Amino acid sequence: MYKSTIMSKRITKFTFVGTLACTFMVSSIGLVNADGHGVYGPFPITEKSYNGSKKNSVSYGGQIARQLQHNALKKLASKGNPNDPTNAPEKRMLSYFNIKDKSKTLAILDPSPSSSKFPVKQKMIGDLSGGANLSGKADKRIQTSWPGNMSGVDVIKFMIKKAGKTKGGVDTRNGMNYPQLISKYTMGAVLYHQACDNYLDEKMTASSKPNNKPYKKGAYYTGKEHSWDEAFGYWGAAAHTMKLTAAQSYDIAKKKDLKAADYNNDG
């Protein structure tokens, strides 16, 4: 149920809400020309200096790719094997944490493209964005709640190493559930951090990313347009969230309601 165009049309219907709650949905985002009943655009190009061929000012495929990289980390964290001398589980998790999938080598793991009940059209992370990773956007500041003066990046890598050597990712002796720990911490240190401490913080000031200039040289969207869109992408909600009931949103998050998820009926 994902299609690729400007960045990607169908993507993470996973819903990231705040630092503690995250329900992942597979929904369309407003990036493309489509029969989306007015939800998906195209949204006009308002950046006056742009002379290219783009017709839709919305673009946040990188954020959606990161949502799916987060999902993959959570899934892989349950595959730890203390008897693997090659550290393969850790290495695979690190690939989803570090790699920008320009060469399209990272498969989408959750939701599964091969699912018969809740399929998605894209197969690879790189189908959504070839320039996105998690490690580059994780909080670089010292995490005072952790020993050793670790940054947010260090903490996630530390937990990945532990998960890779823990059977099933759950250390019952020490009370550590690494799929949950890695997921929740990544949501806070990457997704929430970027949305609330970057795009909706510094980039909302008058002197940063002004609305009468391109976000960056050659961009087809203004500074404030793109800052809002990037924050929305990190939140991760479906473009048509406001047309869903609470029950539908919940069922989509549980991958139960494909009809509600596929708002523009393109399969």
Where are these regions (language model features)?
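Short linear Ser/Thr-Pro motifs
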Residues: 8, 27-28
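Short non-domain terminal segments
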Residues: 12-14, 22, 41
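Sec/Tat signal peptide C-region and signal peptidase I cleavage site
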Residues: 28-34
